[in-house]
Amino acid sequence: MSDEEHHFESKADAGASKTYPQQAGTIRKSGHIVIKNRPCKVVEVSTSKTGKHGHAKCHFVAIDIFTGKKLEDIVPSSHNCDVPHVNRTDYQLIDISEDGFVSLLTENGNTKDDLRLPTDDTLLAQVKDGFAEGKDLVLSVMSAMGEEQICGIKDIGPK
């Protein structure tokens, strides 16, 4: 038996859950919720009173954090909803490849090469222009439910 047969690559999340349960009645505006299997930021919450047949209901209006699409859901306030683990991480921009991927420097000195340029036109222009001008840029990357996307940019001065 060689050592190679027992070697495996560890994954970043190590099997951790992508969501956690939270009672619908406790989710507030600007919190996060999973609607139709998409991570969303809540923009509006309204609750209806208990009626003759059952529970008070929460009506959520939310925006998908990656696509910007508006989604809605109605859930009994006593039921649990899935809430995504949403993380924001800052990485320094090293390079932009010709096929639309960015090369980022992680905190531990490794490079991260699996992220595409942002789809938002304003952000895309800021990244490309800043990089072309030779500025030192830090990109904010939002990750939730196995997806990642560049969502912000900071200029930390000239190189």
UniProtKB/Swiss-Prot annotation:
Organism domain of life: Eukaryota
Leader sequence residues:
none
What post-translational events are described? Answer: Lys-52 undergoes hypusination, a unique post-translational modification that consists in the addition of a butylamino group from spermidine to lysine side chain, leading to the formation of the unusual amino acid hypusine. eIF-5As are the only known proteins to undergo this modification, which is essential for their function.
Q: Which SUPFAM superfamilies does the annotation name?
A: Nucleic acid-binding proteins, Translation proteins SH3-like domain
**A Pfam family annotated for this UniProt entry:** eIF-5a
Q: What does this protein do?
A: Translation factor that promotes translation elongation and termination, particularly upon ribosome stalling at specific amino acid sequence contexts. Binds between the exit (E) and peptidyl (P) site of the ribosome and promotes rescue of stalled ribosome: specifically required for efficient translation of polyproline-containing peptides as well as other motifs that stall the ribosome. Acts as a ribosome quality control (RQC) cofactor by joining the RQC complex to facilitate peptidyl transfer during CAT tailing step.
Q: What is this protein called?
A: Eukaryotic translation initiation factor 5A-5
Gene name in the database record: EIF5A5
